[in-house]
């Protein structure tokens, strides 16, 4: 069944899609996966900055390359994570495996892959990703609309 007004799970994605479309970048399945990737990457970078002794060999020049994993995150990347999840039956573990693949593409990161998700639970990732998505949706969508409404009201 194709997603349209009549087959959507709720009127939010159906009837009101035109009004809520901007929120998809923050609350869709794609967005949640992207935020999970972002949290995992930033956590790994933070471990490197501590510095964790086992990660001393990572130069800070690689941090931008790591951040580009989520900055340039695509639907193909999200689909790859969903494909991994279909095998693992675990959404956050699939993100971890995806990041290990990305580390492989970078080269020279083999010794550090096991520090992706080090000391974390899935809930650590989820309980950071979801509030981050809410924060950014408020800043990028909701607050500007409220400011626009206030400006319009001031004209009366």
Which residue stretches match the model-derived regions?
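A helix-coil-helix interface module used to build multimeric assemblies
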Residues: 2-156
């Amino acid at each position: 069944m194709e997603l349209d007004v009549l087959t959507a799970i709720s009127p939010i994605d159906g009837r009101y899609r035109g009004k809520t479309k901007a929120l998809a970048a923050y609350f869709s399945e794609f967005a949640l996966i992207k935020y999970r990737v972002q949290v995992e990457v930033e956590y790994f970078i933070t471990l490197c900055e501590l510095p964790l002794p086992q990660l001393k060999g990572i130069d800070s020049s690689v941090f931008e390359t790591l951040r580009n994993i989520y900055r340039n995150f695509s639907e193909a990347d999200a689909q790859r994570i969903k494909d991994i999840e279909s095998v693992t039956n675990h959404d956050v573990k699939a993100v971890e495996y995806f990041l290990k693949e990305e580390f492989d593409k970078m080269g020279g990161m083999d010794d550090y892959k096991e520090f992706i998700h080090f000391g974390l639970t899935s809930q650590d990732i989820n309980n950071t990703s979801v509030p981050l998505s809410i924060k950014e949706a408020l800043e990028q969508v909701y607050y500007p609309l409220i400011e626009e409404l206030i400006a319009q009201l001031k004209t009366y």
